[in-house]
């Protein structure tokens, strides 16, 4: 069944062949199930959260014409290598994924801007994901001093082991990158859906129920809000940069 394919994180072509549907239908079913996963993942419980961001290379893969985005606002990348070579550091072509995890295993992973997340973006993110009364442990990035002001906040210095560590979130980053590598690149405008999928898998990985059975139950009971048309028009904050680039190119021409 499709739930089994999603639980095993199979590629789209293999999923379509196993379920007996077209590649497009398999893709849309995946988007629908990701929507259910986002709604079914429990909120984080209070605790001590290790928080840090990681960078994911921006990707324009997919049928951009369906969303009204015409043309590429940059030279085409070959296997992702050209983009990494030309966009080292905190380039706007990198998407910030802000992550946090506590000692209970509760975690969050959300798109949080491009290049480098600002204090305002981080404040909104932490307030939305971390319950009141929790403690937050971060690195020395100055934006966290403002963003975590509503929590008990501790900073660690990577050069001083005695100041503590943020190993829990570093391990979460590794698992997230391994998860995304299965798909050979994820479109930036769909990235949050895949982050929701990863968070769902993390939330239920230690449960007694079989993951396939649980996902099938959640699919059957879930509600879907996005139609096919709305899914194609989905853009997301991380794509605003590219739409502006395209607009600027059109103005120059």
Where in the sequence are the language-model features?
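Residue-level recognition of single "structural anchor" positions
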Residues: 1-253
């Amino acid at each position: 069944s499709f739930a089994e394919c999603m639980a095993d994180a199979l590629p789209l072509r293999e999923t379509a062949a196993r379920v007996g549907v077209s590649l497009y239908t398999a893709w849309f079913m995946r988007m629908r199930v990701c929507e259910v996963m986002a709604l079914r993942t429990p909120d984080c419980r209070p605790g001590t959260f290790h928080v840090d961001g990681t960078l994911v290379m921006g990707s324009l893969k997919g049928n951009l014409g369906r969303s009204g985005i015409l043309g590429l606002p940059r030279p085409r990348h070959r296997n992702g290598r050209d983009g990494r070579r030309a966009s080292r550091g905190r380039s706007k072509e990198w998407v910030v994924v802000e992550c946090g995890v506590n000692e209970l295993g509760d975690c969050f992973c959300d798109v949080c801007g491009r290049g480098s997340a600002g204090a305002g973006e981080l404040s909104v993110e932490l307030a939305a994901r971390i319950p009141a009364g929790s403690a937050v442990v971060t690195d020395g990035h100055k934006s966290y001093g403002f963003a975590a002001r509503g929590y008990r906040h501790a900073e660690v210095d990577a050069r001083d082991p005695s100041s503590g560590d943020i190993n829990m979130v570093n391990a979460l980053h590794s698992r997230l990158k391994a998860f995304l590598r299965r798909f050979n690149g994820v479109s930036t405008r769909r990235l949050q859906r895949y982050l929701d999928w990863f968070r769902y898998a993390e939330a239920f990985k230690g449960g007694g129920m079989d993951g396939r059975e649980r996902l099938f139950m959640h699919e059957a009971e879930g509600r879907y809000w996005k139609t096919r048309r709305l899914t194609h028009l989905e853009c997301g904050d991380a794509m605003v940069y590219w739409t502006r680039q395209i607009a600027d190119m059109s103005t120059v021409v």
